[in-house]
Amino acid sequence: MQDQLDHELERIDKLPKLGLLWVEYSAYALGVNIAPRKRSSKYCRLTRILVLIVNLSIIYSLVAFIMENYMISFETYVEAVLLTFQLSVGVVKMFHFQNKVESCSQLVFSTETGEVLKSLGLFQLDLPRKKELLSSVSLILLNNWMIIDRQVMFFFKIVCMPVLYYCVRPYFQYIFDCYIKDKDTCEMTLTYPAIVPYLQLGNYEFPSYVIRFFLLQSGPLWCFFAVFGFNSLFVVLTRYESGLIKVLRFLVQNSTSDILVPKDQRVKYLQCCVRLFARISSHHNQIENLFKYIILVQCSVSSILICMLLYKISTVLEVGWVWMGMIMVYFVTIALEITLYNVSAQKVESQSELLFHDWYNCSWYNESREFKFMIKMMLLFSRRTFVLSVGGFTSLSHKFLVQVFRLSANFFLLLRNMNNK
């Protein structure tokens, strides 16, 4: 007979998960198939080659612009530097997750199907109120998926703002120059400052201006897929892990309940809880191994980008307020990007800290010798909370987030002082 919990997990697996779906599509657009059970990986290699060629072409064009204007002023090419960093990090992320695509797809599969909770044996025990227990566990999981969808789609909307700005800016600029300013000559400008190399063959250019224009237009889209796709994947995995810990906390809290768990079943019930703890610990280690080094890269680059944006904001305040809206959206996107890592990791850590107290507060002192022994062992194991590290150097937390922003502010002050001199 199939476990009731397994049956419920299959039902939840079939429910639409908008946030995770967009994450999968974003990764797939870069040639990284993190959900092979849903779609084929046949053309992923070709997609990655195409994405790499296009991204390197755009990066080369941006670097060419930076070198051309290097001696003028930093304000002239700061936007090109920002985009170069974003595209470069996107390429690094693409290769990183492709190298770990098996681990990544396994985590996504485990998260979506509830593999960690399957075959626990909990609902094969002789419990009087299995329905109540099952509905409570199911409610925790469903609410957790709702939170995941809300967070991911909120980040989706934020990341879309600078992408839309870059995509529509040349068209609005063209309308303004030709019809509002009433210039004698007007032409379509490039999406952002860049020098795309081309060959002049008589009256023809290769690649043509149209191709160069749309090449640069694709840049913000590649940034979107890398920023949204892989950062939101971290949110999905860690949020789901915190949901698993919530389920375990609920089970531990009721391990000595006379209503839900009879006294003769408590040792077996607690064994199921211990089994779940071991699985969550293994799941956590997989997330840690997948993200710890790429988070270090992301935090370092985000710190530099925030510093440059602060500098750009200071120059805009002096020159005018025309670009302030766009720069603030860009700033919010990058700040939110690094904040999501820390807030999601902090949530997991907070839940694991609460789990330690739940093991201790479950009235274990009135139970059997075997029950007491298992509780003591779990108190020993759960003293070490589930933390996610930054390259193995420090842990993601609210404290680390403050340090990143403080470091960015210090770099900004240093940059401004150097420029003034």
Curated annotation (Swiss-Prot):
This is Odorant receptor 67b. Belongs to the insect chemoreceptor superfamily. Heteromeric odorant receptor channel (TC 1.A.69) family. Or63a subfamily. The chain crosses the membrane at residues 49-69, 72-92, 152-172, 218-238, 290-310, 316-336, 385-405. Pfam families: 7tm_6 (PF02949). The lineage of its organism: Eukaryota, Metazoa, Ecdysozoa, Arthropoda, Hexapoda. One of its GO terms (biological process) is signal transduction. Coiled coil: none annotated. The atypical heteromeric and topological design of the odorant receptors appears to be an insect-specific solution for odor recognition, making the OR/Orco complex an attractive target for the development of highly selective insect repellents to disrupt olfactory-mediated host-seeking behaviors of insect disease vectors. Odor-evoked OR currents are independent of known G-protein-coupled second messenger pathways. Odorant receptor which mediates acceptance or avoidance behavior, depending on its substrates. The odorant receptor repertoire encodes a large collection of odor stimuli that vary widely in identity, intensity, and duration. May form a complex with Orco to form odorant-sensing units, providing sensitive and prolonged odorant signaling and calcium permeability. Involved in the behavioral responses to ethyl acetate, pentyl acetate, methyl caproate, anisole, heptanal, 2-heptanone, r-carvone, nonanoic acid, and pyrazines. Keywords: Cell membrane, Membrane, Olfaction, Receptor, Sensory transduction, Transducer, Transmembrane, Transmembrane helix. It is a multi-pass membrane protein. Residues 70-71, 173-217, 311-315, 406-421 are extracellular. It comes from the Eukaryota. GO terms for molecular function: ionotropic olfactory receptor activity; odorant binding; olfactory receptor activity. The keyword Cytoplasm does not apply. It is found in: Cell membrane. Interacts with Orco. Complexes exist early in the endomembrane system in olfactory sensory neurons (OSNs), coupling these complexes to the conserved ciliary trafficking pathway. Residues 1-48, 93-151, 239-289, 337-384 are cytoplasmic. Its main location: membrane. GO terms for cellular component: cation channel complex; dendrite membrane; plasma membrane.
